[in-house]
């Protein structure tokens, strides 16, 4: 699929992706202010962005997949062309300063990044303060309890994305999410609001021609089940 856009650094895809990373970093800082450890915050933000938002990957797993060094490079290319906005991530820089780069091996398996992987599954979280990986099992129980259960009607991305009744299922799911006030759903709602703002700003700031183009890049390029401009929320 061909999606046109204005000739702007980052275009639609990276224009969205880099800002999504920066918002995830903002959430991490807020959670650390609430006295959660760094590995706990990474676990929770990644879980909310994948499970509660029904995406194929959590935000930090996606950064690992692309490569932390690649993300830093994209941000450095975009920054001189973006006015009144800081496209730089201290979180990305800290990991690279610790020689943690993510990316993939030649056979497609995942290199260590924000997470360490075992047979494709997240097994541990890098803690820059301790300069080592912390097992997911050390943080998952506390974090899952804090976030609370997924809203009624939830389906994992893999089971939802190709369903012919996907639109109706998403409407019902987000109706349940919006009615909930657990910490996980509150975080998800703020994430969705920022998601929508990013998509709208890409049109407002003349990166994308129209909202449908932003949605197309997210759905067909990032394989999301829905775009940022929709009637679900």
Per-region residue spans from a language model:
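N-terminal glycine-rich phosphate-binding loop for ADP-containing cofactors
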Residues: 1-233
């Amino acid at each position: 699929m061909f999606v046109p856009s204005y000739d702007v650094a980052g275009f639609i895809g990276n224009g969205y992706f880099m800002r999504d990373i920066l918002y995830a970093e903002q959430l991490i800082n807020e959670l650390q202010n609430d006295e959660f450890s760094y590995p706990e915050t990474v676990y929770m933000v990644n879980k909310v962005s994948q499970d509660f938002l029904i995406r194929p990957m959590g935000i930090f797993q996606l950064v690992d997949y692309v490569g932390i060094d690649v993300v830093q490079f994209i941000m450095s290319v975009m920054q001189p062309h973006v006015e009144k906005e800081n496209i730089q991530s201290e979180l990305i820089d800290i990991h690279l300063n610790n020689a943690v780069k993510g990316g993939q091996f030649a056979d497609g398996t995942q290199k260590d990044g924000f997470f360490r992987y075992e047979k494709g599954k997240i097994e541990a979280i890098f803690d820059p303060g301790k300069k080592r990986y912390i097992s997911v099992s050390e943080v998952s129980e506390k974090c899952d309890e804090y976030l609370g259960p997924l809203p009624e009607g939830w389906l994992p991305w893999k089971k939802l994305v190709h369903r012919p009744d996907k639109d109706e299922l998403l409407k019902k799911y987000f109706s349940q999410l919006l009615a909930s006030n657990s910490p996980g759903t509150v975080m998800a709602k703020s994430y969705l609001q920022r998601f929508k703002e990013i998509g709208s700003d890409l049109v407002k700031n003349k990166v994308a021609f129209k909202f449908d183009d932003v949605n197309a890049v997210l759905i067909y390029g990032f394989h999301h089940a829905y775009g940022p401009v929709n009637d679900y929320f």
